[in-house]
Amino acid sequence: MIEDIKKDAQDRMGKCVEATKAQMAKVRTGRAHPSLLDTIQVNYYGSMTPLKQVGNVTIEDSRTLAVNVFDRSAIQAVEKAIMSSDLGLNPMSAGATIRIPLPPLTEERRRDLVKVVRAEAEQGRVAIRNVRRDANSSFKQLEKEKECTEDDVRRSEEEVQKITDLHIKKIDELLAAKEAELMEV
């Protein structure tokens, strides 16, 4: 029973790290990356469709993305969706390809993005601590129900704390890497 709780806590903490990593990936850095456009939805024949289902996003060079639209009639809709996104991008179409030059980030914008990334990391840490709290309360519940001893509970809480520290360290590493990437000129 205790092992199940620990395994569940470890799995949930791993998911917290992955979710934090995904949130950090959405933050725009100075470099072109296809995942930058993952959140964009295109009004395609009356329904909102993810951009990657309407076209193929590739990296043209370090500061330019290219979107090869599958259906030429959707080019204007794709351009409009990119322009109306909060990414501050200005697409230029050339035939069935839309080029998106990424403007360099200003120092002020970089600092703002670092704040955003730090907030995402803190949310990840809080989520991991909540998982730890849930696991610890489950251990205490088992002790109340006389299914395990106080020593088992204390030992299990220490093991869950080690798992927690490991996952928080992973988030801190993600944060440090993202901050370095953002502040790189």
From Swiss-Prot:
* Protein family: Belongs to the RRF family.
**What is the originating organism of this protein?**
Shewanella amazonensis (strain ATCC BAA-1098 / SB2B)
Q: What does this protein do?
A: Responsible for the release of ribosomes from messenger RNA at the termination of protein biosynthesis. May increase the efficiency of translation by recycling ribosomes from one round of translation to another.
| Keywords, sorted A to Z | Cytoplasm, Protein biosynthesis
Task: Provide the transmembrane region boundaries.
Answer: none
- GO molecular-function terms, A-Z: ribosomal large subunit binding
Query: What protein name applies here?
Result: Ribosome-recycling factor
Q: Which gene encodes it?
A: frr
Tell me the PANTHER family matching this sequence.
MITOCHONDRIAL RIBOSOME RECYCLING FACTOR PSEUDO 1 (PTHR20982:SF3), RIBOSOME RECYCLING FACTOR (PTHR20982)
Q: Which HAMAP family match?
A: RRF
Q: Any idea where this protein resides? A: Cytoplasm
GO CC annotations? Answer: cytosol
